[in-house]
């Protein structure tokens, strides 16, 4: 290796499958290069063959910049505009550490976040994070707005993340969250939730396997994510009773039928466990993007606005995507959801169906898309316009 940190060489050899004083095939070399580049530990990785018979392999790497500043802007027909600023500083001392700041200003959601990571190696980190969020949130039910809430959210996290297996990430840790509601305005007699300023201490674990070749419009691969959270207000109980927990599962695959046509089946859901549940963690469904306004929000074609569902939710989704003329795409999505307060009676729950037809252009500034959708949760055709990356 040339240009790498000596402390990195052992794990670089491990993840790439390379061994000193051994022979490799061209296929094995290409695979090792893909792994090293995909590790994102260095800004560039290349190789050359030396020796009289070109029998010696030399890998060269270029270190990443110590610091960076990034800016993003997006527009959509719901929030109107969102602006994101991110700055990172990489301190290459004995123990690598990274400090990052992210700020977002938008029509519905604004936040400021600090992240600090101590790297045992570039794929194993101890993480500290704090985020302050202001949220102006509308909640709907069957297409009609039922209430609006404005609140601030303090979020602190200590965790350990491990990405030392190819395409697999594991994370666990401890979180503290505090919700301070400025107001909670109901329409009519829809005052079914008792909400107050409240703090929560939770334990969490998450595992994510992903082999997609692209973040947007992937052409191959799978994504399988499972997460579990255990909520308390004093480390052991909640409101003097047993704590509650949440389990989430999300699976998506890309089936390339031809070079231009793909089918993307998905199955995802979330289950709340316990009888003493808190409002901020109830199941939320709607929108095109997972976690748009609250982390547990599940997307659903045909429901543009966020709605609260029962304690157990399962969604099956089938996405047909046709690429036309370069970076232009036509998408047809059908999905079905079922929800019930009791997981063991989920099949007796409420049925929700919906679908959408959309066009998207994959631009350098992010996806530019327009979507028409409908479902049995509302009586009118819905329209959503998006310009830019999701954040």
Q: Which sequence ranges carry the predicted segments?
A:
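C-terminal hydrophobic structural anchor segments
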Residues: 319-353
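A short, amphipathic beta-strand motif
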Residues: 1-3
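Short, glycine/charged-rich beta-strand-loop motifs at protein surfaces that mediate ligand recognition
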Residues: 146, 304-307, 341-347
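Gram-negative/organellar outer-membrane beta-barrel architecture
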Residues: 6-8, 17, 22-216, 285-299, ...
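Short glycine-rich beta-strand segments
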Residues: 133-135, 177-179, 227-235, 270-274, ...
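Predominantly the C-terminal beta-signal and adjacent terminal strand-loop region
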Residues: 261, 267, 273, 350, ...
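C-terminal outer-membrane beta-barrel translocator/porin domains of Gram-negative envelope proteins
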Residues: 68, 73, 200-324
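Secondary-structure transition into beta-strands, especially the periplasmic turns and strand N-termini
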Residues: 166-168, 259-261, 326-328
């Amino acid at each position: 290796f040339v240009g790498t940190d000596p402390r990195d060489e052992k794990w670089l050899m491990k993840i790439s499958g390379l061994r000193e004083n051994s022979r490799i095939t061209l296929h094995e070399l290409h695979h090792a290069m893909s792994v090293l580049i995909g590790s994102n530990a260095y800004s560039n990785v290349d190789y050359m063959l030396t020796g009289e018979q070109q029998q010696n392999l030399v890998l060269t790497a270029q270190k990443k910049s110590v610091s960076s500043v990034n800016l993003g802007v997006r527009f959509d027909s719901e929030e109107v505009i969102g602006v994101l600023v991110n700055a990172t500083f990489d301190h290459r001392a004995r123990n690598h550490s990274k400090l990052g700041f992210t700020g977002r200003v938008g029509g519905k959601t604004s936040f400021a976040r600090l992240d600090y990571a101590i790297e045992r190696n570039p794929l194993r980190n101890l993480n500290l994070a704090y985020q302050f969020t202001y949220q102006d949130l509308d909640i709907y039910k069957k297409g009609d707005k039922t209430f609006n809430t404005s609140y601030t959210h303090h979020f602190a996290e200590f965790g350990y993340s491990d990405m030392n297996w190819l395409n697999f990430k594991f994370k666990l840790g401890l979180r503290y969250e505090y919700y301070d509601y400025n107001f909670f305005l109901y329409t009519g007699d829809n005052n079914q939730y008792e909400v107050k300023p409240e703090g929560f201490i939770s334990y969490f674990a998450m595992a994510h396997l992903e082999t997609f070749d692209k973040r947007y419009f992937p052409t191959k691969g799978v994504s399988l994510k499972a997460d579990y959270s255990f909520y308390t207000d004093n480390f052991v109980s909640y409101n003097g009773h047993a704590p509650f927990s949440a389990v989430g599962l999300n699976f998506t695959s890309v089936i390339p039928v031809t070079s231009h046509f793909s089918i993307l089946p998905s199955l995802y859901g979330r289950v709340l466990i316990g009888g003493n549940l808190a409002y901020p963690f109830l199941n939320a469904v709607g929108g095109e993007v997972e976690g748009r306004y609250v982390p547990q929000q599940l997307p659903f074609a045909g429901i543009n606005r966020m709605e609260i569902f029962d304690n157990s939710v399962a969604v099956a989704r089938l996405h047909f995507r046709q690429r036309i003329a370069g970076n232009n795409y036509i998408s047809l999505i059908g999905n079905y959801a079922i929800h019930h307060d009791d997981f063991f009676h989920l099949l007796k729950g409420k049925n929700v169906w919906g679908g959408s037809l959309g066009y998207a252009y994959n631009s350098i500034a992010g996806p530019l898309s327009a979507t028409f959708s409908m479902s049995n949760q509302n009586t009118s055709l819905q329209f959503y316009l998006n310009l830019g990356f999701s954040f």
